[in-house]
């Protein structure tokens, strides 16, 4: 039977200390879970994307179950798709994890030039996101909204394949998309800050389409860097202090460019398992880093494999001067054995203490 050491801080105290660049007792646990949280409390995957109350309680109760940092977030799935008129497919099959794009709103070059920033109070899932944020505020949690990634959202508007073709053949169209997305994200930020104030905000930039499996570093530099940097800078101008950024997938070649984007004081930067945490530490010495146990191993591996990957992450992450969260390299897959996830928390008990 596992015997855990007595914590000297609550999860809330631990998060506050890290955000204020203070010492903590041990590494905090920060699993990213959407569909997995639904499975933990007996909800369907669709429930946690279409019902903000169910999404909130699934995440909060899963957080309580595993003893994780007090931050839960909600983006409605495929964020940017429905807000601009794209059609989506719900995760109704056994192995689907999240909402996927069915038909992009932008089908032609003419559609790009007609595109306008939607009303952030009424478009798509934004009313549900606002309801979720009001629950965050009610329960004293950090308040979240979407702050990127630029190309991920543009891909939900135009389709990733079409967007990638245009990067080569019609780059002005992609720049137009990125401009619209940037203005959209800033408008969301202004609405959220006007509603709640900036003090408890930790918005989220989620960037899977920016991965080098899809685009080159040169394309990242042209189409993502200036726009994502602008969004983050405007958020800080509104009084936001911290941004959570998930650098998803294989992005080693993009890291020097991501490092040019301000993340906060400090920011929280999460990495896919393709990025070594020691490399991440070198590029983001002043931010909290997070990661990055391989999600596929969490779902299909043995508890011993998950425990060993967690130990390696802890060994590397604990050396990072600005703080570290142990978490998965991306969303925890919905079919993951709960014991495998708990094993990550056990590894923190065994290897994650600072003194």
Identify the residue ranges that each predicted region occupies.
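Membrane helical hairpin/interfacial module
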Residues: 57-87
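Membrane-interface helix-loop-helix modules in multi-pass inner-membrane proteins
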Residues: 101-113
């Amino acid at each position: 039977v596992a015997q855990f050491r007595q914590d000297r801080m609550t999860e809330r105290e631990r998060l506050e200390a890290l955000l204020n660049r203070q010492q903590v007792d041990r590494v905090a646990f920060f699993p990213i879970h959407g569909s997995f949280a639904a499975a933990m409390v007996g909800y369907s995957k669709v429930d946690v994307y279409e019902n903000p109350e169910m999404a909130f309680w699934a995440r909060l109760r899963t957080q309580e179950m595993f003893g994780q940092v007090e931050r839960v977030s909600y983006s409605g799935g495929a964020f940017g798709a429905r807000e601009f008129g794209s059609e989506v497919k719900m995760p109704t099959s056994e192995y689907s994890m999240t909402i996927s794009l069915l038909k992009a709103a932008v089908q032609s070059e003419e559609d790009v030039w007609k595109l306008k920033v939607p009303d952030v109070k009424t478009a798509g899932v934004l009313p549900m996101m606002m309801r979720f944020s009001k629950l965050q505020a009610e329960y004293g949690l950090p308040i979240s909204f979407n702050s990127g990634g630029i190309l991920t959202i543009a891909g939900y508007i135009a389709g990733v394949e079409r967007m990638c073709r245009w990067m080569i053949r019609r780059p002005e169209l992609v720049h137009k998309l990125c401009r619209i997305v940037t203005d959209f994200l800033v408008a969301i930020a202004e609405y959220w800050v006007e509603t709640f104030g900036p003090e408890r905000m930790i918005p989220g930039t989620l960037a899977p389409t920016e991965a080098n499996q899809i685009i080159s570093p040169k394309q990242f530099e042209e189409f993502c860097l200036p726009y994502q940097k602008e969004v983050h800078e405007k958020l800080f101008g509104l009084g936001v202090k911290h941004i959570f950024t998930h650098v998803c997938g294989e992005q080693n070649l993009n890291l020097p460019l991501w490092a040019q984007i301000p993340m906060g004081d400090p920011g929280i930067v999460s990495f896919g398992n393709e990025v070594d945490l020691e490399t991440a530490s070198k590029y983001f010495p002043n931010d909290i880093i997070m990661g990055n146990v391989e999600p596929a191993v969490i779902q299909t591996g043995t508890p011993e494999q998950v425990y060993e990957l967690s130990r390696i992450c802890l060994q590397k992450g604990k050396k990072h001067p600005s703080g570290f969260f142990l978490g998965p390299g991306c969303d925890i897959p919905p079919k993951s054995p709960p014991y495998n996830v708990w094993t990550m928390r056990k590894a923190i008990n065994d290897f994650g203490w600072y003194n």
